[in-house]
Amino acid sequence: MTALENNSPYIAQPKILVATDCIVFGFDEGILKLLVFRRRIDPLKGEWSLIGSFVNEEESVPDAARRVLLQFTGLENIFLEELRVYSDVERDSGARCISIAQYALIRINDYDREQVELHGAKWFALEDIPQLVLDHNVMIFDALDRLRQKTTHKPIGFELLPEKFTIPQLQSLYEAIHQTKLDDRNFRKKLLSFDLLIKLDEKDKSTSKKGAFLYRFDYGKYKKLEESGINFVL
């Protein structure tokens, strides 16, 4: 980086902190959950908070978010998307700080439980989310709204499921995200009409003796359809 002259406009500007806060969604036994932790710095130390960090000088915002997610969950290469910028002047009483929020979708059985416990993090069902610090509850509301919009035309919901899943599990996920009951027959019919599920010669017998066939999402086929302009609309 080139050294700046003392009279440079850059030097004269007030210093504003940049942070990233991560809204981490997981899906467990029919329930959509969020990962939060007890804040470890003042102000509001000990209060419930989204996981996050200040952005270091040498990293981008997505890199900072990936660093935080690895630190708290032990996971890499997970779905991550920028949500929006939160820049209210008085949003943080500690200092002037802009937060660029990201939302992440993880397979809840894949995370490192020791890492989560080490940082005092905890999963909460949506309806049980406590009051969080700063504007973090607003971030959750916005992230949930984005997730609902996105899952109507993009297959990102599969990021929350195991690699092998049943159609009832997938339906349960969409019902949890959209907070509505779906018709079993119509959901299955529409889902299978996309021809994007690979039926496996395996069954999940955890809920019945007969069991339900397991499927895998065909990402390769979806990419080709997406390139041709066909959307995944449920």
PLM features per residue range, with description:
Residues 7-48:
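N-terminal strand-loop-strand
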Residues 16-18, 62-66, 70-112, 148-157, ...:
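Active-site segment of metal-dependent pyrophosphate-handling enzymes
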Residues 31-72, 85, 152-172:
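Conserved Nudix-box catalytic region and its N-terminal flanking loop in Nudix hydrolases
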Residues 34, 39-41, 45, 52, ...:
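Short, His- and charge-rich active-site/binding loops that engage polyanionic ligands
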Residues 103, 113-147, 162-168, 186-195, ...:
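NUDIX/MutT-family hydrolases
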Residues 172-181:
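Short helix-coil junctions and helix-kink-helix linkers
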Residues 182-213:
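RNA substrate-recognition surfaces in RNA-acting enzymes
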Residues 203-234:
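Long, intrinsically disordered, low-complexity Ser/Thr/Pro-rich regulatory/activation regions
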